[in-house]
Amino acid sequence: MKGKEEREREGGGGAVGPGAAGPGAGGGSPEKSHSAQEHKEQGNRLFGGRKYPEAAAAYGRAINRNPLVAVYYTNRALCYLKMQQHDKALADCKRALELDGQSVKAHFFLGQCQMEMENYDEAIANLQRAYNLAKEQRLNFGDDIPSALRIAKKKRWNSIEEKRINQENELHSYLTRLIMAEKERELAECRKAQQEENVDESRGRVQLAGIEAKHDKYLADMDELFSQVDEKRKKRDIPDYLCGKISFELMREPCITPSGITYDRKDIEEHLQRVGHFDPVTRSPLTQDQLIPNLAMKEVIDAFISENGWVEDY
């Protein structure tokens, strides 16, 4: 069985492999195409040895020989991804998509680049596109694309939550300053009135203490309110084990396969009808009548939904 890196380089489960030039390959002479293919195969060998800079250079030579083959760009993009050179990988993915808009690898690697560059909306869109194309083309990438999509969605959620936290902290600081400023203003006015009215010292202390207590309560109530918001936010996380392996969303009707993998029923049934009769993670043979409702998981999911009303917006 091929390892993940080899499947990525070749295109995974039936995608364009080392021996295929891919769409748009007819732009050069037979001699040039043959030479480009040799460079590509050299790049594959170097990539297999984890020599990513050398592999990228070999794919670059293939591109120089024949710049019309999308897979050369996606192979080099994967090298750049391994070297964390995301700008270069991004450019190669976009060029590959210009040559072949249906390239699963190009969308997959582009989504990974955008995720690393914290462009989460674009990353999710491209990873979802890669997943949909893989289903349409009946290519099996195992859990590679679904896993990347789950990570991108979680990172986007965390980014949104971080912004919310910063906004709440700024609001808390602003309101604290307002309350403190109002307290100082009232204290100053009270002291001035006490002097003008010649209020005795004991009565004056009581008046000032009342102002202090009032604003201290404002601060305490505000802190309690923000604390409640913070406590609710800490619970805004859907555990991975409650998410489907295909849709990456909270499961609604979990069912388990003979391999022990739990899926959302509508997603696994769609997979069996559109892609093939096998478990998408383990690749073991699977038919619809082998799906068994996971009642224990359903009970856990229902309890989670009832306790977390925000879950629909996750």
Curated annotation (Swiss-Prot):
A Gene Ontology BP annotation from the UniProt entry: protein quality control for misfolded or incompletely synthesized proteins
Lineage: Eukaryota, Metazoa, Chordata, Craniata, Vertebrata
Subunit-structure text: Homodimer.
Gene Ontology MF term list: protein homodimerization activity; protein-folding chaperone binding; ubiquitin protein ligase activity; ubiquitin-protein transferase activity; ubiquitin-ubiquitin ligase activity
Organism: Gallus gallus
Function: E3 ubiquitin-protein ligase which targets misfolded chaperone substrates towards proteasomal degradation. Collaborates with ATXN3 in the degradation of misfolded chaperone substrates: ATXN3 restricting the length of ubiquitin chain attached to STUB1/CHIP substrates and preventing further chain extension.
UniProt-annotated stretches for the region Disordered: 1-47
Keyword DNA damage in annotation: yes
Reaction equation(s) it catalyzes: S-ubiquitinyl-[E2 ubiquitin-conjugating enzyme]-L-cysteine + [acceptor protein]-L-lysine = [E2 ubiquitin-conjugating enzyme]-L-cysteine + N(6)-ubiquitinyl-[acceptor protein]-L-lysine
Keywords linked to the UniProt accession: Cytoplasm, DNA damage, DNA repair, Mitochondrion, Nucleus, Repeat, TPR repeat, Transferase, Ubl conjugation pathway
Biased composition (Basic and acidic residues): 1-11, 31-43
Full protein name: E3 ubiquitin-protein ligase CHIP
